[in-house]
Amino acid sequence: MAGLKRRASQVWPEERVEQEHGLYSLHRMFDIVGTHLTHRDVRVLSFLFVDVIDDHERGLIRNGRDFLLALERQGRCDESNFRQVLQLLRIITRHDLLPYVTLKKRRAVCPDLVDKYLEETSIRYVTPRALSDPEPRPPQPSKTVPPHYPVVCCPTSGSQMCSKRPARGRTTLGSQRKRRKSVTPDPKEKQTCDIRLRVRAEYCQHETALQGNVFSNKQDPLERQFERFNQANTILKSRDLGSIICDIKFSELTYLDAFWRDYINGSLLEALKGVFITDSLKQAVGHEAIKLLVNVDEEDYELGRQKLLRNLMLQALP
């Protein structure tokens, strides 16, 4: 019972050794994934494993971490096999939790180098007024420069991205030379970065669709579980509302930084709701509630930030 009452902030015994190698323990991974599972998710998962987990074990499940611990006690998950956990997360359409099903420790948060650089260099553009000038001068008309808005490139079908098909025929010597020059970019040339945006619409809950439609009369418990599992998987796949993947090209660091902050604080999600959750989609799903999931790869943002930061450093050079 003491193990069941363990808090998420406490350190598991095996984690003290694995921390030295930059790894999470299996139970720490259960803590991370389990805290993001809602009570509705846990009820759906328990419903799928009603024939595998006995009544006593099922009565101890209070949250997502308890369910994952029950899977471990049933031999369905260990340090070398996360297949069952990954498959269950896909069935309940919690694709946002798939990156957390790993023992590799995530990198610690470091200070924002962009903010630090902008703060240090902003003093160069502040010129205090001379004390000998008592009257304010009329403002000089500034030359307006059109901002470099990001370019969005969305796939037209499947996972195919917006790429030009190369022309057929024999390549000339001049084109080969141009291609060689394009491989090695000019160090003074302005760099751009691509940020991949994934948007997915899905139902808020699937219990009403699963109840009454998942049934098996097979005698063997394992066969009965697989049949129920396949039926639930087919139903959830039929309720897939689809997704879209976009590549957004940035050439200015300020726009990239503002885009990332809007993604973190939820402003991007609220703005995309009016674009993707249309009246036709609401009419297609009927009275069921739907939600929008937005994902931006953090590694793309960090790599893009380094490229655009290099542009600022080149501009600061004399």
Curated annotation (Swiss-Prot):
Residues 128-191 are annotated as: Disordered. Interacts with CASP8, CASP10, KRT8, KRT18, CASP3 and FADD. Homodimerizes and heterodimerizes with DEDD2. This is Death effector domain-containing protein. Widely expressed with highest levels in testis. Within the testis, highly expressed in germ cells but not expressed in Sertoli cells. Gene3D superfamilies: Death Domain, Fas (1.10.533.10). Residues 25-103 form the DED domain. Exists predominantly in a mono- or diubiquitinated form. It holds the Pfam family TRADD-like_N. GO terms for biological process: decidualization; extrinsic apoptotic signaling pathway via death domain receptors; negative regulation of protein catabolic process; negative regulation of transcription of nucleolar large rRNA by RNA polymerase I; regulation of apoptotic process; spermatogenesis. It comes from Rattus norvegicus (Rat). GO terms for cellular component: cytoplasm; nucleolus. A scaffold protein that directs CASP3 to certain substrates and facilitates their ordered degradation during apoptosis. May also play a role in mediating CASP3 cleavage of KRT18. Regulates degradation of intermediate filaments during apoptosis. May play a role in the general transcription machinery in the nucleus and might be an important regulator of the activity of GTF3C3. Inhibits DNA transcription in vitro. It is found in: Cytoplasm; Nucleus, Nucleolus. GO terms for molecular function: DNA binding. Keywords: Apoptosis, Cytoplasm, DNA-binding, Nucleus, Repressor, Transcription, Transcription regulation, Ubl conjugation.
